[in-house]
A protein has these predicted regions:
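Juxtamembrane intracellular "pre-TM" segments in multi-pass secondary transporters
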Residues: 2-13, 218-255
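Multi-pass alpha-helical transporter architecture, strongest
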Residues: 12, 109, 205-216, 360, ...
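Short amphipathic helix-loop junctions that connect adjacent transmembrane helices
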Residues: 29-57, 270-290
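A membrane-interface helix-boundary motif in multi-pass transporters
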Residues: 54, 175-204, 402-421
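Loop-to-transmembrane helix entry/capping segments in MFS-fold secondary transporters
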Residues: 55-58, 146-157, 289, 369, ...
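Helix-to-loop junctions at the C-terminal end of transmembrane segments
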Residues: 74-88, 305-319, 404
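Structural signature of the two symmetry-related core transmembrane helices
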Residues: 91-106, 321-336
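Helix-loop junctions at membrane interfaces in 12-TM secondary transporters
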Residues: 108-121, 338-350
Length: 437
């Protein structure tokens, strides 16, 4: 096998290629086609009797998402501990890639008649996507030097945006012109079938393009045997990482700030398409389909620019000032979203979300990479990072779903999350002042 040196452009591109493979899940399943399909299932009634409760459809998907992230938050320390000790994080990355991709294919059979099976597939698709992401993130310090991390992180997100948009364009073509692809039925029936075929395309794309990273990323082989004690190494290592934070107060403060603003960013992004599907006054179902896909496409395309602009700004002004600015932009976006009702207003919001979304995600990751101490145990530090992110999403989705269920409006949930961006900005300002003083 070809051995690629750390810091080489080829190795960085190989690592970033997994973003190209994996990001189609986040765009097609999380953000566009699946939310539209899911909303179409509840066209006549937003509520469903399930688990002995009458739940609003958006609250149900919020709770299911929270459950998936709870599993990820619990398993991530265990699996990363095993991977770091045994040296097989690529094997775990492969396994959860296949779990996620095959579950996406299983979404083809999602309907109200077998709602439980559909939710299970949605659940495991999310688990697979995010657990594979844990091990992917942990490779960043292994493939890039500190001065390369911002650029490498931005390259990953940019490739992910481009690749996912390419597949989305194909899926959009299928949904809008199903007869061209030989999909039969009435216009409405054929469009729904095309959405289901889109789920299959995500699974195939994800599996196919992930082979590049699987082929060339370093294996980190270790001869340490797997024992019962190793299973809980992850939690012991997380505890050790937490103790390490005591010697690195800036890093400890940063992970706290990250927990708050990441919870808000990830939650808002996970429900954005459902918000657009339910809260915006679209003229017709076809206009809704086109409008939502166009909105998310705008987000993805502008996010490419946003991620690179943010990387350039961080070089000039520093990471923390840029992160603080991005948090205040998100405060404005949440306030604006509360009043958004027309498609044009939604498109404007989508543009600003795109500019700030890619930037805050890539910069948050690379900033953490710079703050962690020099160590060979990068997996445990990134496991702590990912566990914080996942735990935040669990709390965020539960809060969002509960407010939505009680008030009957997603607008109130979005407005509530404005407070988390304010807290995140305040915490980052404190860190910046401590560093400058």
């Amino acid at each position: 096998m070809l051995h690629l040196q750390k810091g080489s452009n080829t190795l960085i591109r190989v690592w970033a290629s997994y973003d190209w493979a994996n990001s189609v899940y986040f765009l097609v399943i999380t953000s566009t086609i699946f939310p539209i399909y899911y909303g179409s299932l509840f066209a006549d009634n937003l509520y469903i009797e399930i688990f002995g409760q009458s739940l609003k459809n958006t609250a149900l998907i919020s709770y299911t998402t929270a459950a998936a992230f709870a599993v990820v938050a619990i398993l991530s320390p265990i699996l990363s501990g095993i991977a770091d000790y045994v040296g097989n994080k690529k094997s775990f990355m492969k396994f959860y890639t296949y779990v996620g991709a095959l579950s996406c294919i299983g979404l083809y059979w999602f309907n109200l008649d077998n709602i439980y099976f559909g939710l299970i597939c949605y659940f495991f698709a999310s688990v697979g996507a995010w657990l594979s992401w844990v091990f992917y993130n942990s490779y960043l310090p292994d493939i890039a030097h500190p001065e390369q991390m911002d650029k490498a992180s931005a390259m990953g997100y940019s490739l992910g945006y481009v690749g996912s948009v390419l597949l989305l364009v194909v899926n959009l073509s299928m949904v809008l012109n199903p007869s061209f692809y030989g999909i039969e039925g009435t216009a409405s029936e054929a469009s729904v079938k095309a959405m289901k075929y889109s789920f299959i395309s995500v699974g195939i794309w994800w599996i196919a393009f992930s082979q590049i990273a699987f082929r060339f990323l370093p294996k980190n082989i270790s001869k340490n045997p797997l024992t019962n004690k190793v299973i809980f190494n992850g939690y012991r290592e997380l505890s050790a990482v937490w103790k390490t934070f005591s010697n690195h107060p800036i890093l400890k403060s940063y992970i706290g700030a990250f927990f708050v603003f990441s919870m808000a960013v990830q939650t808002v992004m996970l429900i954005a398409a459902y918000f657009g599907e339910q809260e915006i006054n679209w003229g017709s179902s076809s206009e809704k389909q086109i409008g939502l896909i166009v909105s998310i496409t705008i987000i993805q395309l502008i996010a490419i620019v946003g991620a690179n602009i943010t990387a350039q700004c961080s070089k000039k002004f520093g990471n923390l000032p840029v992160l603080i600015t991005l948090n205040f932009i998100w405060v404005s976006l949440c306030l604006y979203a509360f009043f958004v009702r027309s498609p044009m207003q939604f498109y404007i919001a989508a543009g600003f979300v795109g500019l700030s979304m890619g930037g805050i995600q890539s910069l948050a990751r690379s900033t953490y990479s710079k703050f962690i101490p020099k160590t060979d145990d990068t997996t445990s530090f990134f496991s702590f990072y990912s566990t914080s992110q996942m735990t935040g999403i669990v709390i965020g989705m539960l809060l969002f779903g509960t407010i939505d269920q009680i008030t009957g409006s997603m607008r109130n949930s979005v407005l509530f999350f404005l407070s988390f961006f304010l807290i995140g900005a305040f915490l980052l300002i404190r860190i910046h002042r401590r560093m400058t003083n």
